[in-house]
């Protein structure tokens, strides 16, 4: 679950 959140967080930060 943490991995999924981290992935989404990175995507948001990139955007």
From Swiss-Prot:
GO terms for cellular component: cytoplasm. Its EC number is 2.5.1.18. It catalyses: RX + glutathione = an S-substituted glutathione + a halide anion + H(+). One of its GO terms (molecular function) is glutathione transferase activity. It comes from the Bacteria. Its main location: cytoplasm. Keywords: Cytoplasm, Transferase. Transmembrane segments: none annotated. It is found in: Cytoplasm. Belongs to the GST superfamily. Monomer and homodimer. Conjugation of reduced glutathione to a wide number of exogenous and endogenous hydrophobic electrophiles. This is Glutathione S-transferase. It comes from Pseudomonas sp. (strain M1).
